[in-house]
Each structure stands twice: as structure tokens, then as C-alpha cells.
């Protein structure tokens, strides 16, 4: 397995694909988790993470340019909620050959209002009853599902089905499983965080990224610059770093007039 580092990102192949989009090729490294994608500096329309060892789709920094994620042949079984805030313009996600099991596992994708292409072939979920009807109902903007067009008659049939008692019961069951899955994920993450001390934190939003850039300009030592640059590239804010940013905001020019704040980790 290879860790997804800023160095790997910078060394990987970058090119203009046949759709005339700028693409980053991160295929086949057996990467176990998504991290440090902030190092892309939001320069890509497509990121290809196929043929890796991902189990969760999570930890995406703010990448408003990103329109397509290729995630074929991983082991993804969970999609984190709220990713639409990180990649609001995502229009295509290809998840062929993963391990998504239930229709409730797809609920986190509903927030992507520009998602027009989804592929879930060779996932257990694609064989579930009412799969295609559910997707047509939940994703009104979806045009291609598993490389087959969703037609207006498909949407109408889906809407009619989910108005029936059977359809409403199906939606209730999906919602129940989705809530259970989300609660289990939160509990698991909380448990994992107990031994990490201050390494938790959250994903950086655009305002955070701007504050980090300003802090880099004001840094008074190389160590501070390197630390801030690492955080900027990863897109992940450690807990203590949030306190440091608050100190910078409160103190204006910073300690001793230099704008530098001690970085204690």
C-alpha cells in the first residue's frame, strides 16, 4: 500500500483527457484512504482513484473545480455525508466494482444537485429490488445510471411507485437504515479519535484556506511555514490549529508585532 502524500500527487501523471478536462491519474497505487488532496490546489476537473484499496469515500477538501471522480475497483462500502459541500460541482461519479450494499448507503449522494452520471455496476446494491426506481426518484437531475439513460417515463414510474403504500414503506426502511448507518459511523469515528489526541479536527473550508495562506505570509520561521504549508496541502485542520487561527484573528498583527504565533503540536 502507498500513502497518498503531496509528493505522490505532484509526481503523478497529469494530462488533458479526451473530454478536454484536466485529469490527475492516481490509479493503481493501492492507496488505503483519501488524504492530502488539498495538494492538488483545485487544478483538476477529474481525479482518477481507480484500482486502489479505498474503503470509504471521505476526507475530500474543498475542490469546487472537480467535476468527475473515478473510483472503479476499490473496496468502498461507505460514503460520508456532507461531501457535497467539499465538491459542490461534482457531475459524475463512477463506482464500478466496489462494495456498496444497501440503497441507504447511497443517501449521502443525494446532496449532489449537479450529479448527472452515476455508475454502480458490480456493487451488491445494484441488484437490490427497486434500485433503478429509487435512483430515478431520489436523483431528479440524473441522466445516466450504470451507463443507461434514465428517461422521463422511468421518472414517472418511479414517482408513481413511491406514492403507493409499498413505495412509502420502502422509503421508510431506507431512511431507517441510513440513520442507523450514520449513527454507527459517527460512533466508530469517535472511538477511533480517542487515541489520537489532538489529531482530529475537520476539513478546511475556503475561508480556512485563505486564513492559512495569510498566516504563511506572516510566519516568522521556516518551521511555521512548513507546518502551515502541510496543513494547506492536506486540507485537514488539526484541533490545536483551530485555536492558533483564533489567536491570530484576535491578536491582529500577532505576538511581538511579527504576526507569528507559536505552533505547539
From Swiss-Prot:
<dbReference type="GO" id="GO:0006325">
    <property type="term" value="P:chromatin organization"/>
</dbReference>
<feature type="repeat" description="LRR 1">
    <location>
        <begin position="20"/>
        <end position="41"/>
    </location>
</feature>
<dbReference type="GO" id="GO:0030620">
    <property type="term" value="F:U2 snRNA binding"/>
</dbReference>
<dbReference type="InterPro" id="IPR032675">
    <property type="entry name" value="LRR_dom_sf"/>
</dbReference>
<keyword id="KW-0677">Repeat</keyword>
<feature type="repeat" description="LRR 4">
    <location>
        <begin position="89"/>
        <end position="110"/>
    </location>
</feature>
<dbReference type="GO" id="GO:0005686">
    <property type="term" value="C:U2 snRNP"/>
</dbReference>
<dbReference type="GO" id="GO:0000278">
    <property type="term" value="P:mitotic cell cycle"/>
</dbReference>
<dbReference type="InterPro" id="IPR044640">
    <property type="entry name" value="RU2A"/>
</dbReference>
<feature type="repeat" description="LRR 2">
    <location>
        <begin position="43"/>
        <end position="64"/>
    </location>
</feature>
<keyword id="KW-0687">Ribonucleoprotein</keyword>
<keyword id="KW-0539">Nucleus</keyword>
<comment type="subunit">
    <text>Interacts with the SMN complex.</text>
</comment>
<comment type="similarity">
    <text>Belongs to the U2 small nuclear ribonucleoprotein A family.</text>
</comment>
<keyword id="KW-0433">Leucine-rich repeat</keyword>
<feature type="domain" description="LRRCT">
    <location>
        <begin position="123"/>
        <end position="161"/>
    </location>
</feature>
<dbReference type="GO" id="GO:0007283">
    <property type="term" value="P:spermatogenesis"/>
</dbReference>
<dbReference type="GO" id="GO:0071011">
    <property type="term" value="C:precatalytic spliceosome"/>
</dbReference>
<dbReference type="Pfam" id="PF14580">
    <property type="entry name" value="LRR_9"/>
</dbReference>
<feature type="repeat" description="LRR 3">
    <location>
        <begin position="65"/>
        <end position="86"/>
    </location>
</feature>
<comment type="function">
    <text>Involved in pre-mRNA splicing as component of the spliceosome. Associated with sn-RNP U2, where it contributes to the binding of stem loop IV of U2 snRNA. In the germ line, has a role in oogenesis, by regulating spermatogenesis and nurse cell nuclei chromatin decondensation and dispersal, probably by regulating the splicing of proteins necessary for germline differentiation such as the meiotic protein mei-P26.</text>
</comment>
<dbReference type="InterPro" id="IPR001611">
    <property type="entry name" value="Leu-rich_rpt"/>
</dbReference>
<keyword id="KW-0694">RNA-binding</keyword>
<dbReference type="GO" id="GO:0071013">
    <property type="term" value="C:catalytic step 2 spliceosome"/>
</dbReference>
<dbReference type="GO" id="GO:0000398">
    <property type="term" value="P:mRNA splicing, via spliceosome"/>
</dbReference>
<dbReference type="GO" id="GO:0030532">
    <property type="term" value="C:small nuclear ribonucleoprotein complex"/>
</dbReference>
<protein>
    <recommendedName>
        <fullName>Probable U2 small nuclear ribonucleoprotein A'</fullName>
    </recommendedName>
</protein>
Amino acid at each position: 500500500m502507498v500513502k497518498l502524500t503531496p509528493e505522490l500527487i505532484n509526481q503523478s501523471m497529469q494530462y488533458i483527457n479526451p473530454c478536454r478536462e484536466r485529469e490527475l491519474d492516481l490509479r493503481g497505487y493501492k492507496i488505503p484512504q483519501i488524504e492530502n488532496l488539498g495538494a492538488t490546489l483545485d487544478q483538476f476537473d477529474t481525479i482518477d482513484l481507480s484500482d486502489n484499496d479505498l474503503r470509504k469515500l471521505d476526507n475530500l477538501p474543498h475542490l469546487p473545480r472537480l467535476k468527475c471522480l473515478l473510483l472503479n475497483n476499490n473496496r468502498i462500502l461507505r460514503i460520508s455525508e456532507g461531501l457535497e459541500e467539499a465538491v459542490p460541482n461534482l457531475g459524475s461519479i463512477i463506482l464500478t466494482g466496489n462494495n456498496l450494499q444497501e440503497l441507504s448507503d447511497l443517501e449521502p449522494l443525494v446532496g449532489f444537485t449537479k450529479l448527472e452520471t452515476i455508475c454502480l455496476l458490480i456493487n451488491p446494491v445494484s441488484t437490490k429490488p427497486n434500485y433503478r426506481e429509487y435512483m430515478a426518484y431520489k436523483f431528479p437531475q440524473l441522466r445516466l445510471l450504470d451507463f443507461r439513460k434514465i428517461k422521463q417515463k422511468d421518472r414517472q414510474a418511479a414517482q408513481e411507485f413511491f406514492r403507493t403504500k409499498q413505495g412509502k414503506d420502502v422509503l421508510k426502511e431506507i431512511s431507517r437504515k441510513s440513520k442507523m448507518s450514520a449513527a454507527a459511523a459517527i460512533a466508530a469515528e469517535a472511538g477511533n479519535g480517542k487515541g489520537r489526541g489532538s489529531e482530529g479536527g475537520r476539513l478546511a473550508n475556503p475561508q480556512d484556506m485563505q486564513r492559512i495562506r495569510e498566516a504563511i505570509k506572516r510566519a516568522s520561521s521556516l518551521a511555521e511555514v512548513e507546518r502551515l504549508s502541510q496543513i494547506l496541502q492536506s486540507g485537514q485542520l488539526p484541533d490545536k490549529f483551530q485555536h492558533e487561527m483564533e489567536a491570530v484573528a484576535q491578536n491582529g498583527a500577532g505576538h511581538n508585532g511579527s504576526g507569528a504565533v507559536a505552533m505547539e503540536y
